[in-house]
Amino acid sequence: MPSDLCPDLQALAPLLGSWVGRGMGKYPTIQPFEYLEEVVFSHLDRPFLTYTQKTRAITDGKPLHAETGYLRVPQPGHIELVLAHHSDIAEIEVGTYSVTGDLIEVELVTTTIGLVPTAKQVTALGRFFRIDGDEFAYSVQMGAVGQPLQDHLVAVLHRKQ
């Protein structure tokens, strides 16, 4: 664990670093798809972790999606995530986390979604992270374009060596 990591974040220290892997997406309004992904958690000696995420197409490496944000722990067991997406969406998610040995589980739901006028209508988002040693699995749920909240993305990433 980094010696300069804020004490509130120590339970989440295993997130720090780069994670790479593959994911799959689906939604009623689009064709199912697969993607390559890299997620990076880092810190700036402040009471939050920084988060960046980039995906690209498996077939040609073309960029697909990107987000960046901040994750903080307002009190033990509780977590907040502020994100900006490349697709004209900003979101605030709140939730809980638990740590059992090497296993960290995080569950988040949106409290606020901001959209620019030309963005697709996204009405709800939720995330579940499961970190077990050097494996980071997640799922994302989305409600958008008239569809209810439902499964959208699932991925398994591994710590980049």
UniProtKB/Swiss-Prot annotation:
Free-text cofactor note: Binds 1 heme b group per subunit, that coordinates a highly solvent-exposed Fe(III) atom.
Pfam families per UniProt: THAP4_heme-bd
Cofactor needs: heme b
GO molecular-function term, one example from the UniProt record: metal ion binding
EC number: 5.99.-.-
Entry keyword annotation includes Isomerase: yes
Top-level division of the source organism's lineage: Bacteria
Residues bound to heme b: H152
Keyword Heme: yes
Reactions mediated catalytically: peroxynitrite = nitrate
Motif (GXWXGXG): 17-23
SUPFAM superfamilies from the UniProt entry: Lipocalins
Gene3D superfamilies per the UniProt record, alphabetical: 2.40.128.20
Role summary: Heme-binding protein able to scavenge peroxynitrite and to protect free L-tyrosine against peroxynitrite-mediated nitration, by acting as a peroxynitrite isomerase that converts peroxynitrite to nitrate. Therefore, this protein likely plays a role in peroxynitrite sensing and in the detoxification of reactive nitrogen and oxygen species (RNS and ROS, respectively). Is able to bind nitric oxide (NO) in vitro, but may act as a sensor of peroxynitrite levels in vivo.
PANTHER family: PEROXYNITRITE ISOMERASE THAP4, THAP4 PROTEIN
Subunit structure: Homodimer.
Family from the record: Belongs to the nitrobindin family.
Name of the molecule in the record: Peroxynitrite isomerase
Protein's organism: Mycobacterium leprae (strain TN)
